[in-house]
């Protein structure tokens, strides 16, 4: 059962409508972090008591006997800028921690506070256009780490860690798609990786622009807590005359990155242990064919990219 709460902080009131009596005080604090930027450990919620004592983080909201739309006061200082708070966590093996996003989608995709964050990115995030968008082209958005190359293995050059057929894949895709790179890292590292791989200097294709972690947003999921995602709405908002849900596809090895846009995401198999798999991995070859097939369509909304291999086999069998 939903338990609407109004939280006052910094002269403003924040409406919390997505938590239930089964959620905990910590869930509330984590949600408030997404709204205010104040870290949970810095928050003090006045009026939340159990048996006369301040409620601990593990106490369920139902135990507080709150009436709907109860107003509570939050004290706490935002010690970091909002952008820092919303940025990605320190580097870890996201592939191990990935989860199936399907059950979370309905609760997250259209939530008002997430859409407001996207609007803020559209207004504030600066995109450096490397090559102008082309009229009539579809959009391919690509992750970098484990999608285009193995960023964990050691090698003398980046080329040794590059996913097989990368340049052939991008050359073919460029015929039908504008290409955008989006990585959950700092722009200077993205630029360095693209240069090392020979992507930014290849004469056979061009990159339209690149996005870094500052274009991402943090969303709260009821069961998984806070996660960072890549909302395609940032691109659609900035380039609405060229790109939309109908003509965009995004490749990423981490499914939760397209939690805000599940219809447009294709979860690619991660490319790891390059020295062992360099001669075996043919993922980009097959995806080259898939992109070529769906480029014939006027609208991608009828596709389910989860079954892209089935779709490709069916088309090639005709």
Swiss-Prot record:
Entry keyword Nucleotide-binding: no
Cofactor(s) for this UniProt protein: Mg(2+)
Residues annotated to bind Mg(2+): 143, 145, 253
Key words of the record: Acetylation, Hydrolase, Magnesium, Metal-binding, Nucleus, Protein phosphatase
Domain Ubiquitin-like, first and last residues per copy: 3-81
UniProt GO cellular component terms: nucleus
Superkingdom, taxonomy of origin: Eukaryota
Domain FCP1 homology stretches: 133-294
Annotated positions of the N6-acetyllysine modification: 117
Catalytic activities: O-phospho-L-seryl-[protein] + H2O = L-seryl-[protein] + phosphate; O-phospho-L-threonyl-[protein] + H2O = L-threonyl-[protein] + phosphate
Residues the record lists as N-acetylalanine modifications: 2
UniProt xrefs under PANTHER family: UBIQUITIN-LIKE DOMAIN-CONTAINING CTD PHOSPHATASE 1
Role of this protein: Dephosphorylates 26S nuclear proteasomes, thereby decreasing their proteolytic activity. Recruited to the 19S regulatory particle of the 26S proteasome through its interaction with 19S component PSMD2/RPN1. Once recruited, dephosphorylates 19S component PSMC2/RPT1 which impairs PSMC2 ATPase activity and disrupts 26S proteasome assembly. Has also been reported to stimulate the proteolytic activity of the 26S proteasome.
Domain notes for this protein: The Ubiquitin-like domain mediates interaction with proteasomes.
Designated name of the protein: Ubiquitin-like domain-containing CTD phosphatase 1
């Amino acid at each position: 059962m939903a338990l609407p709460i109004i939280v006052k902080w910094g002269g403003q009131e924040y409406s919390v409508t997505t938590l239930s009596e089964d959620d905990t005080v910590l869930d509330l604090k984590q949600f408030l972090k997404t709204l205010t930027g104040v870290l949970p450990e810095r928050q003090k919620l006045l009026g939340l008591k159990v048996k006369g004592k301040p409620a601990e983080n593990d106490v369920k909201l139902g135990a507080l006997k709150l009436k709907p739309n109860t107003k509570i006061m939050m004290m706490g200082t935002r010690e970091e800028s909002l952008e820092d708070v919303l940025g990605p966590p320190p580097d870890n093996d996201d592939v191990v921690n990935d989860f199936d996003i399907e059950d979370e989608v309905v609760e997250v995709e259209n939530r008002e506070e997430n859409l407001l964050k996207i609007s803020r990115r559209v207004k504030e995030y600066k995109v450096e256009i490397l090559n102008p968008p082309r009229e009539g082209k579809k959009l391919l958005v690509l992750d970098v780490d484990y999608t285009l190359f193995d960023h964990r293995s050691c090698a003398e050059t980046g080329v040794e860690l590059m996913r097989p057929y990368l340049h052939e894949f991008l050359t073919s895709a460029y015929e039908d798609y504008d290409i955008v790179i989006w990585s959950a890292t700092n722009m200077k590292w993205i630029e360095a990786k693209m240069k090392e791989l020979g992507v930014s200097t290849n004469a056979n294709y061009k990159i339209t622009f690149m996005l870094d972690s500052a274009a991402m947003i943090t969303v709260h999921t009821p069961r998984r807590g806070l996660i960072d995602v890549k909302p395609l709405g940032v691109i659609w908002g900035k380039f609405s005359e060229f790109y939309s849900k109908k003509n965009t596809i995004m490749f990423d090895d981490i499914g939760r990155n397209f939690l805000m846009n599940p219809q447009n995401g294709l979860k690619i198999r991660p490319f790891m242990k390059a020295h062992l798999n360099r001669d075996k991995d043919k993922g980009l070859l097959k995806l080259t064919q898939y992109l070529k097939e769906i480029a014939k369509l006027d609208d991608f909304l009828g596709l389910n990219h989860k079954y892209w291999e089935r779709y490709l086999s069916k088309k090639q069998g005709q």
